[in-house]
């Protein structure tokens, strides 16, 4: 019997620091102590990278609180771009593990009937000229297996002597400006405080209530995703799947493919060990009476429902149908792709609570940048706090948090807008037009301004200007978003109005987004 490990809860004691150690040469040098005490809420990748980078920059990580009862190895593959991977160069053991776990894959784009549109190809950042520019930095694989990547971070956190406290659900965030602290109250009534609290506890974080007075309202994107993963040996039992990909698996290769049909698309990853897919239909294609999409990673959907949705358009390749048919019962998640308008403020009024990752800005799969942005956030925040608290003066933390916010907001907003462009391409109703003109246009966009960014270097370049802007009111201009772009705030409602008016998001972009 093959087990489904799409959602696995790990042992909370496995990463006890007493079980892990590093020799001095395997840890990065620490910056001079800032005497800043940092409390982190959330032990996902954003929280763990925040802990690692705060330690490296000389801050004291006093606690890492996590609401789950142990590590949660949710998901299958994630894309972590060069702008995030480059920041891990300071951690020798992480670099070694990234190289050991390295797996390459080629990318294909196909019509839903199996007709090839483009491929083999790759994400733009791994073209030969860009690989040469990153010589000496950690290799950026086309994907990371999330379970392996996350366990790597947990090991490194344990090696520097930090322990995640599981089963700690935060019910309230607070700050005391006079006392110079922020804090949280957990479900059991315990109070924890520090000079700075980092909310890395994803969407619906209770820090929203302190910072904005409410949770950000959600609006449907008009799409949802049926997402599942299963062992490759199970998928290979289907003759059509075996015929199409059996030799690929036998050669030990991995494929990353996008299958595109009118009103829906399917992202597919095939490796020798497991297969993962996500079917994203427009809402009008959803099956009446099916499982309502909710923001939960508990798998509760049977494959027949996914097949019913798939068959809303005819002529799917039998290999795709066979893959879904061989997915174990109740092993599929139906997740709504909800949009939340980006808030400008990610810090509390007194600056003692600050948000990173999905707590500050949610993303959707079409951006292919959620994990990348979370790591960029963590690195940026730790470096800003280093400069703000230089000389062992933790009182500078609120200003450091605000500078972090200033450096990140516009870039994140632009990345979010890119997800609409990718969604348009992947859900195009008339793929014949794409095929006739330029097949390259079907590719998921991963532009230079996104992947060539170095968040740590950017802090050291811009900190003085940002400080002068916030303290003295001087002009400030970010340069970490598309060149030539005249940044303006935008809302989901405005984007939807343009789409309903027949306008393409890509045609409305100014500056060089490519």
Curated annotation (Swiss-Prot):
This protein's record includes keyword Oxidoreductase: yes
Basic and acidic residues bias locations: 8-17
GO MF annotation terms: FAD binding; monooxygenase activity
Organism, scientific name: Aspergillus aculeatus (strain ATCC 16872 / CBS 172.66 / WB 5094)
Organism lineage string: Eukaryota, Fungi, Dikarya, Ascomycota, Pezizomycotina
Region described as Disordered: spans on this chain: 1-29
Keyword terms, alphabetized: FAD, Flavoprotein, Monooxygenase, Oxidoreductase
Metabolic or biological pathway, per its Swiss-Prot or TrEMBL entry: Secondary metabolite biosynthesis
Role description: FAD-dependent monooxygenase; part of the gene cluster that mediates the biosynthesis of the tetrahydroxanthone dimer secalonic acid D. The pathway begins with the synthesis of atrochrysone thioester by the polyketide synthase AacuL. The atrochrysone carboxyl ACP thioesterase AacuM then breaks the thioester bond and releases the atrochrysone carboxylic acid from AacuL. Atrochrysone carboxylic acid is decarboxylated by the decarboxylase AacuI, and oxidized by the anthrone oxygenase AacuG to yield emodin. Emodin is then reduced to emodin hydroquinone by a yet unidentified oxidoreductase.
Protein known as: FAD-dependent monooxygenase AacuC
EC numbers, comma separated: 1.-.-.-
InterPro entries reported in the protein's UniProt record: FAD-bd, FAD-dep_Monooxygenase_BioMet, FAD/NAD-bd_sf
Positions annotated to bind FAD: 79, 146, 358, 371
